[in-house]
């Protein structure tokens, strides 16, 4: 047996903790030295209030911070201890609230009260810490950093494009999709001159059409034309697969490598892709997943996924490589924070715009394309190219809840989205009687973007009760028409008072000379029951509204006469000088009601949309009414709910040219999306039984159908299934020339735009008017930094430098594919504290910037200390808000609060060690010695002694 002197080991640990001889029993043995007075910490006391008492006092409204609750009978105790203990006790109360919220049997009502108390406590603690003055250290509610680098920024300029996987196999395999007479054109514009290069694979002759051979051929063509742009093969090595055989995992070799095509562009060469033969392309979004996997109605445990699928239209040939008519071109699963796609529309350039509702923690993430989701739910505008690549995402930036309900795209590429919002929406132009930021009552909102995806304006208009915008359409002269429903009068509304629950309305907005939204009119209409606008179409000065009024499908025609003026407006030019420039805009408009038409009862159905195609009006939806008031029926209803498409004159009072076709099976079939192109209609929705003779695929299927409205013939249809056997298509959009040989190469049609907006409010969830604060000394004056609509990273960096008195060094850095801000001290003597904005305007999370203290450091006596010679800094890392309403939120809250409490304990130990002269290496220094020994050191020595007793059998 190996033996040793345990007293020697104990002496070592006593020296490590500053306890020897009489000092080990808590009595100073060195009266000639200055006495260090270290009080017992509250977390070491047996007299701490139980958690239930902390919860009760917090819910009763008692203050969280109480310096008087932690007094010591010891004389000479530093005031720092009292302030630290007050902070700790407040955090301990937060911890008790978070723990209580997760206990069994806690009602939703109590959770709500706990949440309110927690939010109050967070605010109180933050205010206390931010104004705290300590002698030996500094506390911050944020982090402690040598530099603060953002995680969210603006996209870097990249001049490359990588397709999705085109083939899985071996490097020298011939690619099936390259067979046949496959060709496309590339137009290259360089220094104002445009040249076209034709890629016709038949020119390869007998050369095998492998990925490498095809790329070599295309590069030869580009080089011969004198261009720098080239192509390369993107190869991803395949991975072994693991399968279960008789309950045991068995590894199998990879099926092959994945091969994609990469376009390596040049900054001075603009590329436009086209094909000699095209066909319509159909884009369908689908929501899939079992809504109740545990079969318990009281739980909300459904996990859903959203997909975007591209089909080539049936009945037309898209040319070789375009895919079989009615064939699937691609199907992609979208980011999990997309809870639902409400509407999709194709643009004139062939791109696909989608309006999506996004929510936090759907798949463990809290962002949409890197942009943090501020509230429980938000609205996102997503733009994809024809190959399914996301070009940009624009989030609304609501801090509470928002829902997207309509989307419109103008011929010039301008985009508008509309819906409902509750809570705060920073940067919006508000109506005169909107609901407050703290209200859960919804208001209508409309946001307009330019062709680059930069927000032009957002308007929020509401009444005293709930309202929402449900339909949009662009008109001439910059007018945007908005339809919706409201439970109370909207500002400036005219028309008969229907006095129903929900009343329908039609409004119009234009951009005034200063670039702000201007309401032109608001017309209300409907019945004494519930009414709502379903869709709007515009034909010159005619506006046709499709609405559901007391269950009836209604059409209303209006004439709009705008007053367009040209006025001189003073604006700031690109050189920073003001100048007077002429601006043409719609100043006023008058609305005249025209014909109305009742299409019949929907009997529980809905109008899915209105379309104008070939000079005729199309109405799509679903109904249980087998006698709709539309003439010229080409097919009969099938029973239950059926889809329908009606075609009629734009003069809605003229019924002579009516055509009606039903689509459905013996069960109930709904229509959730509707599109028309060249006289052909596409319907998507939930499928019932025996729909078009196709058997059920999953538990609850969806469908896609291509219908010839003139004959009623179904040119092509397909049942759709998805995750867990549940799927419902939610939108459909058609591009008249979106399918072509380009699909074989995974390339998008149209001009490949490598540029991205450099505006902060476009690339992030930040809103104009959002803020954060900066100060350069403890308890110093706070300077507010405000985000403007046109701010870039560079202009924001200049603002931060000025706000810090140029004590901050602010530069742009790289984070993945984004450029972000990086803030650091301009000198060793500079300290910058970054704090959240007030009043719900905080922008730090939207920029991925951590609040806290940024300072230079140095190493001194084994410790990392501030380079300016000030005391240590401790960061509590407390966010402005924590969530107790969900399990994930409670788990996060407990983690955050525990981390903050740990920082306070560390701060206590550090100043106690300093007072007792204990260094990091276990030796004693010239600090204060003697005096009362703190309890945490006694506990450490007791633990060491107990360990030695176990080792030696003592």
Swiss-Prot record:
Tell me which SUPFAM superfamilies the record gives.
Answer: Quinoprotein alcohol dehydrogenase-like
Name by which UniProt lists this protein:
Regulatory protein FlaEY
Q: Which UniProt keywords apply?
A: Bacterial flagellum biogenesis, Transcription, Transcription regulation
Q: Which GO terms describe its biological process?
A: bacterial-type flagellum organization
Source species, domain of life: Bacteria
Q: What does this protein do?
A: Functions in trans to modulate the level of transcription of the flagellin genes and several genes encoding chemotaxis functions. It is itself temporally controlled.
UniProt-listed InterPro entries: Motility_Chemotaxis_Reg, Quinoprotein_ADH-like_sf
Record keyword Amino-acid biosynthesis present: no
Q: Coiled-coil intervals in this record?
A: none
Q: Which cysteines are joined by disulfide bonds?
A: none
């Amino acid at each position: 047996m190996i033996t040793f002197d345990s007293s020697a080991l104990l002496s070592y640990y006593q020296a490590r903790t500053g306890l020897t001889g009489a000092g080990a029993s808590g009595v100073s043995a060195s009266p000639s030295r200055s006495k260090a007075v270290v009080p017992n910490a509250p977390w070491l006391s047996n007299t701490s209030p139980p958690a239930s008492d902390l919860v009760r006092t917090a819910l009763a409204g008692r203050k969280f911070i109480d310096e008087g609750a932690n007094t010591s009978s010891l004389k000479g105790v530093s005031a720092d201890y009292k302030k630290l203990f007050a902070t700790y006790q407040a955090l301990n109360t937060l911890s008790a609230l978070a723990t209580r919220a997760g206990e069994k049997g806690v009602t939703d009502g109590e959770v709500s009260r706990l949440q309110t108390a927690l939010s109050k406590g967070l605010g109180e603690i933050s205010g206390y810490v931010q104004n705290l003055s300590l002698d030996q250290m500094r506390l911050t509610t944020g982090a402690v950093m040598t530099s603060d680098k953002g995680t969210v920024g603006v996209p870097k300029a990249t001049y490359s494009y990588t397709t999705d996987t085109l083939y899985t196999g071996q490097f020298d395999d011939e690619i099936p999709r390259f067979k046949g007479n496959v060709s496309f054109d590339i137009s290259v514009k360089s220094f104002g001159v445009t040249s076209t290069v034709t890629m016709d694979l038949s020119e390869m002759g007998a050369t095998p059409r492998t990925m490498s051979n095809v790329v070599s051929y295309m590069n030869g063509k580009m080089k011969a034309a004198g261009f720098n742009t080239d192509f390369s093969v993107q190869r991803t090595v395949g991975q072994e697969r693991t399968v279960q055989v008789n309950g045991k995992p068995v590894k199998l070799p990879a099926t092959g490598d994945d091969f994609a095509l990469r376009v390596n562009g040049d900054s001075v060469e603009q590329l436009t892709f086209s094909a000699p033969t095209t066909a319509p392309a159909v884009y369908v979004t689908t929501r899939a997943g079992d809504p109740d996997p545990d079969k318990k109605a009281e739980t909300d445990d459904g996990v859903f996924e959203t997909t975007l699928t591209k089909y080539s239209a049936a009945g037309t040939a898209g040319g070789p490589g375009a895919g079989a008519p009615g064939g699937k071109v691609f199907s992609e699963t979208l980011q999990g924070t997309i809870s639902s796609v409400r509407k999709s529309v194709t643009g004139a350039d062939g791109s696909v715009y989608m309006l999506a509702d996004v929510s936090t923690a759907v798949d463990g993430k809290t962002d949409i394309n890197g942009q943090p989701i501020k509230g429980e739910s938000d609205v996102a505008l997503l733009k994809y190219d024809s190959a399914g690549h996301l070009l940009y995402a624009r989030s609304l930036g609501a801090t509470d809840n928002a829902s997207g309900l309509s989307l419109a795209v103008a011929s010039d590429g301008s985009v508008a989205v509309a819906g409902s919002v509750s809570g705060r929406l920073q940067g919006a132009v508000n109506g005169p009687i909107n609901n407050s930021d703290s209200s859960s009552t919804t208001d209508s909102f409309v946001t307009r973007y330019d062709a680059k995806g930069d927000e032009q304006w957002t308007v929020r208009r509401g009444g005293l009760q709930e309202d929402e915008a449900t339909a949009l359409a662009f008109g001439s002269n910059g007018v945007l028409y908005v339809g919706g429903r409201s439970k109370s009068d909207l500002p400036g509304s005219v028309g008969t008072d229907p006095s129903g629950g929900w009343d329908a309305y039609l409004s119009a907005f234009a951009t005034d000379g200063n670039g702000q939204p201007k309401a032109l009119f608001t017309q209300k209409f409907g019945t004494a029951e519930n009414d709502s606008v379903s869709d709007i179409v515009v034909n010159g000065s005619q506006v046709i509204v499709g609405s559901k009024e007391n269950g009836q499908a209604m059409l209303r025609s209006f004439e709009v006469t705008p007053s367009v003026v040209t006025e001189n407006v003073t604006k700031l030019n690109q050189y920073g000088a003001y100048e007077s420039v002429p601006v043409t805009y719609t100043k006023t408009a008058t609305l005249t009601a025209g014909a109305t038409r009742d299409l019949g009862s929907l009997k529980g159905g809905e109008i899915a949309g209105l379309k104008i195609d070939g000079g005729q009006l199309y109405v799509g939806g679903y109904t249980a009414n087998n006698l709709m008031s539309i003439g010229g029926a080409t097919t009969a209803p099938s029973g239950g709910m059926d889809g329908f498409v009606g075609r009629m004159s734009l003069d809605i009072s003229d019924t002579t040219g009516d055509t009606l076709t039903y689509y459905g099976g013996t069960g109930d079939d709904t229509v959730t999306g509707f599109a028309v192109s060249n006289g052909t209609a596409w319907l998507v929705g939930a499928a019932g039984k025996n729909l078009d003779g196709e058997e059920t695929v999953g538990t609850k299927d969806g469908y896609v159908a291509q219908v010839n409205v003139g004959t009623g013939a179904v040119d092509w249809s397909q049942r759709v299934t998805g995750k867990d056997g549940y799927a419902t298509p939610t939108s459909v959009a058609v591009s008249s020339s979106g399918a072509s040989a380009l699909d074989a190469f995974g390339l998008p049609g149209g001009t490949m735009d490598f540029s991205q907006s450099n505006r902060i409010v476009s690339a992030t969830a930040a809103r104009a008017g959002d803020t954060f604060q900066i100060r350069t000394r403890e308890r110093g004056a706070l300077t507010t930094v405000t985000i403007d609509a046109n701010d870039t990273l560079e202009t924001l960096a200049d603002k931060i430098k000025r706000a810090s008195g140029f004590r901050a060094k602010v530069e742009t850095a790289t984070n993945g594919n984004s450029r972000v801000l990086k803030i650091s001290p301009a000198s060793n003597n500079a300290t910058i504290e970054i704090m959240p904005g007030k009043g719900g305007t905080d922008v730090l999370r939207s920029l991925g910037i951590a609040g806290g203290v940024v300072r230079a450091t140095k190493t001194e006596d084994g410790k990392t200390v501030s380079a300016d010679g000030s005391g240590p800094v401790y960061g509590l890392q407390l966010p402005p808000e924590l969530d107790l309403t969900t399990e994930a939120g409670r788990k996060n809250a407990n983690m955050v609060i525990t981390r903050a409490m740990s920082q306070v304990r560390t701060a206590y130990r550090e100043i106690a060690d300093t007072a007792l002269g204990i260094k990091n290496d276990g030796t004693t220094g010239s600090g204060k010695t003697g005096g009362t020994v703190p309890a945490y050191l006694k506990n450490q020595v007791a633990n060491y002694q107990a360990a030695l007793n176990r080792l030696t059998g003592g």
